[in-house]
């Protein structure tokens, strides 16, 4: 998006050649989404999430980029790119809240709140096995529902939680990060 006001909720945006989501200025809310960059055909694939307050030489104030209760992951050790102009007076406002991120851990940023960072040394995280039901790079088959080991389970904040997941299933009292709520039996709407 360029200088737009957008809201992305309960969405899965995955495996694109370019950035899965790219925000150039404006206002954006990414709420309870799964952004996963496992695009297999080009090592120069984009980021899972790119946000900036400029494009080329043109300043585009980033009024807000809120990533809430979301998963942002992929093959690379860092699938999130925040690019800002050198001029500190230019607006560049972002927040990551109760999200699962594949990026180097940040400890001194007040805009990163209650976030879980994936271990970039863990090969199961790189392949998606840590989080998802199926990431089969050989056959190009993917299922981005959460598996039982995912650190995304029960880590969303109620404050920004949506009542239903992308499949239309009711989220429980301890909602999960990402667009899919984990259920032990995927055909059942109740956790066992």
Which residues fall in each region the model found?
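Predominantly extracellular beta-rich ligand-binding scaffolds that present long acidic/polar faces
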Residues: 9-143
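Extracellular beta-sheet-rich ligand-binding/adhesion modules
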Residues: 1-15, 186-192
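Surface beta-loop-beta hairpin patches that serve as ligand-binding interfaces in beta-rich domains
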Residues: 141-143, 147-192
């Amino acid at each position: 998006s360029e200088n737009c006001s957008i809201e992305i909720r309960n969405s899965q945006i995955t495996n694109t050649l370019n950035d899965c989501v790219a925000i150039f200025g404006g206002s954006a809310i990414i709420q309870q989404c799964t952004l996963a960059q496992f695009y297999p055909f080009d090592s120069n694939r984009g980021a899972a999430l790119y946000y900036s307050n400029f494009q080329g030489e043109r300043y585009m104030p980033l009024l807000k980029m809120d990533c809430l209760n979301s998963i942002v992951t992929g093959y690379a050790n860092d699938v999130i790119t925040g690019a800002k102009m050198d001029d500190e007076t230019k607006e560049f406002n972002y927040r990551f809240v109760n999200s699962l991120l594949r990026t180097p851990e940040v400890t001194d940023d007040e805009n990163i709140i209650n976030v879980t960072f994936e271990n970039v040394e863990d090969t199961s995280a790189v392949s998606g096995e840590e989080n998802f039901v199926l990431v089969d790079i050989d056959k190009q088959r993917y299922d981005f529902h959460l598996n039982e080991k995912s650190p995304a389970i029960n880590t969303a904040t109620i404050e920004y939680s949506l009542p239903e997941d992308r499949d239309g299933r009711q989220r429980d009292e301890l909602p999960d990060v990402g667009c899919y709520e984990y259920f032990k039996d995927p055909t059942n709407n109740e956790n066992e």
